[in-house]
Curated annotation (Swiss-Prot):
GO molecular function: caffeoyl-CoA O-methyltransferase activity; metal ion binding
EC number, as in UniProt: 2.1.1.104
Binding site for a divalent metal cation: D151, D177, N178
Record-linked CDD domains: AdoMet_MTases
Keyword Protease: no
Assigned keywords, A-Z: Lignin biosynthesis, Metal-binding, Methyltransferase, S-adenosyl-L-methionine, Transferase
One Gene Ontology biological process: lignin biosynthetic process
One Pfam entry name: Methyltransf_3
Stated name of the protein: Caffeoyl-CoA O-methyltransferase
Classification lineage: Eukaryota, Viridiplantae, Streptophyta, Embryophyta, Tracheophyta
Amino acid sequence: MAFVLPAKGILQSEALKQYIYETSAYPGEHEQLKELREATTKKYGSLSGMSVPVDEGRFLSMLLKLMNAKRTLEVGVFTGYSLLSTALALPEDGQVTAIDKDRGAYEIGLPFIQKAGVEDKINFIQSEAPPILNEMLCNDKQPEFDFAFVDADKSSYKHYHEQLLKLVKIGGIIAYDNTLWYGLVAKEVDDEVPEPLRMVRTVIMEFNKLLSSDLRVEISQISIGDGVTLCRRLC
């Protein structure tokens, strides 16, 4: 029998999740975000869970506005729900650089980005992230970002962290998605974890430990979606 992923996110009460969505997320969701979310579900089915949930999108949008962020970076795009949330939250002269090797998934979201009138705020780069980030670091006019959002291959999070600490300005924030990994980080023994999820669980737990001892950042782990860890760069 094929392995079926558990429900994404750490909130296991479906009724409570729907209450949160219906009272504080769906009512203010931009129409193009709603249409993108529905198109992603239609195209990818259960795999649409790779997209950030609507409440997490609202959280990130508010965070960007509170920060007065203007220049942001996104590593891992999928169909672009978080990317569109970001572009809508940025001011007219804001810019988000988005990196993903899968142009096809991005094309699903592109019509909704265009309808929302924010395509000019987005610089999409089809590539693996490490070489692009290295290229930025080697540039004489090295960019300085206010905010970075990472939702990509978990095994590379430690590597991305070192690169992003040089690209995000002091006082800026790096946000890492999926840092509670279906809530499985709290399981005490591997036998309680579905075998296909064990390796990434181990990687995430090691990464969380690394962040907790990294004196270069101040962290806050948010229990929204599948877990989001905010890292404020201190030095």
